Amino acid sequence: MKKVVLFTLLITGLSFAGEQKEANESMILFWKAVNTVILLGLVYYFGGKHIKKFLNGRRENVANMVLEAQKMREDSQKALEDAKRKLEEAKYKLEESIKISKETAEREREHAIMQANEIAERIKMQAKETINIEIRKAEAKLKKYAAEKALEVSKSLIESSINPQTSNELIKKTIKGLEA
């Protein structure tokens, strides 16, 4: 029924629109409006479902795009927060590493100084011992030299002051002293 009414209106509209003999401007305007309404009606009738389907699909696509954009924004926010947190953790770890490195370096420096002092003390002690040994050796050599010189001097004195008769008397006295 709708089709018949629309077809009739179309034919009527076209026939009246084609008639221009005695038409005034208001009638022309009226029939142009009728033709436009008929055209829009036909477009709606034959293409309404497709247009509606297209617009609904487009609306759904736009809504999906908005949802995806919101999800991507949330994901980006989470990633940004994670990156900030990791940056803070990295800064903290860096500060801790620097602190530990400084403490370790200080301990190593103190340990090295302590070892150097111990080595210096050992070297001093060894030097003192070496000096004492050398002093004792020198004293022993001096004593030996002094004894040898004293013996030489004694021999020369005895040889010069003792003659054979004095020597015999001295031997006899020594033997008597040993017998007693």
Curated annotation (Swiss-Prot):
Source organism superkingdom: Bacteria
Membrane association type: Single-pass membrane protein
Transmembrane segments: 26-48
GO molecular function, one term: proton-transporting ATP synthase activity, rotational mechanism
Main subcellular localisation: membrane
Record carries keyword Cytoplasm: no
Keyword Ion transport attributed: yes
Localization in the cell: Cell inner membrane
Gene Ontology CC: plasma membrane; proton-transporting ATP synthase complex
Keywords: ATP synthesis, Cell inner membrane, Cell membrane, CF(0), Hydrogen ion transport, Ion transport, Membrane, Transmembrane, Transmembrane helix, Transport
Pfam families: ATP-synt_B
Subunit structure: F-type ATPases have 2 components, F(1) - the catalytic core - and F(0) - the membrane proton channel. F(1) has five subunits: alpha(3), beta(3), gamma(1), delta(1), epsilon(1). F(0) has three main subunits: a(1), b(2) and c(10-14). The alpha and beta chains form an alternating ring which encloses part of the gamma chain. F(1) is attached to F(0) by a central stalk formed by the gamma and epsilon chains, while a peripheral stalk is formed by the delta and b chains.
Cited HAMAP family: ATP_synth_b_bprime (MF_01398)
Functional note: F(1)F(0) ATP synthase produces ATP from ADP in the presence of a proton or sodium gradient. F-type ATPases consist of two structural domains, F(1) containing the extramembraneous catalytic core and F(0) containing the membrane proton channel, linked together by a central stalk and a peripheral stalk. During catalysis, ATP synthesis in the catalytic domain of F(1) is coupled via a rotary mechanism of the central stalk subunits to proton translocation. Component of the F(0) channel, it forms part of the peripheral stalk, linking F(1) to F(0).
Family: Belongs to the ATPase B chain family.
UniProt name for this protein: ATP synthase subunit b
Source organism (scientific name): Sulfurihydrogenibium sp. (strain YO3AOP1)
